[in-house]
Amino acid sequence: MILYEYPFNERIRTLLRLEDLFERFTFFLTQEDAREHHVALTTLFEISEVAGRADLKSDLMKELERQRQTLAPFRGNPGIEQSALEAVLGEIEQTLAGLSQMQGKTGQHLADNEWLASIRSRAIIPGGTCKFDLPSYYAWQQIHPDQRRQDIAKWVTPLLPLRDAAIIVLRLARESGQASKVMAMQGSYQQMLSGRSYQLMQVRVAPELRVIPEASANKYMLWVRFTVQDGDLRPRAVDVDVPFQLTLCSL
């Protein structure tokens, strides 16, 4: 099944973006070629932009603290697997400690590094990081891959508490949902939300159907409409019934 996810609010949208960026960053950082490490570095700049939202850190701390207070009373409950509960609570408490130790504006350490700032300003220009534009960057790209990885890992370290917090919040949200099998009649589906507040919607479709869900929602109702791509990859509305799995997630 192919999984599509749709955030219902700006906070979850930001966390999904962070998750995607960190996954890309990790993939390219583990590679060997200097061009792959260039992608890792430019992705780090993107992470800094997204993570630099003024209230992100405080939002994450509030949510983790709320989850900690929700889960802590289950300690000693015979109906709850205690080892799993303690693992989650320990993870939350460790991440809260990491967030509380973050000082200053998020990503400021990258802005304060003149060398990185010069690369960042050139990277937004198409072809702006050629060797004749940034000879010192080109020289750095010639050093051993392990040293490049070590440098990039050092630059990303101050941002890792945000990554860890995003992972926990998204995991708890995803685990809260229960998948149901539904049918989009003639490619369209709608469902009343009955006043319940959700943060995330998941749509799973069989790959052989080759359909693409487009979703929207408000506090009363959600809509899912399926399209297919024509020869020019442009979306075209589906006019047949489409089976899919729908999961609504709420923290």
UniProtKB/Swiss-Prot annotation:
The UniProt entry, under Pfam families, shows: ZapD
Keyword check for 4Fe-4S, yes or no.
no
Q: Name one GO cellular component term.
A: cell division site
InterPro entries referenced in this protein's UniProt entry, alphabetically: ZapD (IPR009777), ZapD_C (IPR027462), ZapD_sf (IPR036268)
Q: Which UniProt keywords apply?
A: Cell cycle, Cell division, Cytoplasm, Septation
Quote the subcellular location field of this record.
Cytoplasm
Keyword RNA-binding recorded: no
Q: Name one GO biological process term.
A: FtsZ-dependent cytokinesis
Which residues does UniProt call coiled coil? none
User: Main localization of the protein?
Assistant: cytoplasm
* Top-level taxon: Bacteria
Q: How does it assemble?
A: Interacts with FtsZ.
Instruction: Provide the function of this protein.
Output: Cell division factor that enhances FtsZ-ring assembly. Directly interacts with FtsZ and promotes bundling of FtsZ protofilaments, with a reduction in FtsZ GTPase activity.
Q: Which family does it belong to?
A: Belongs to the ZapD family.
User: Which NCBIfam families does its entry note?
Assistant: PRK05287.1-4
Output this protein's name. Cell division protein ZapD
Q: Which organism is it from?
A: Paraburkholderia phytofirmans (strain DSM 17436 / LMG 22146 / PsJN)
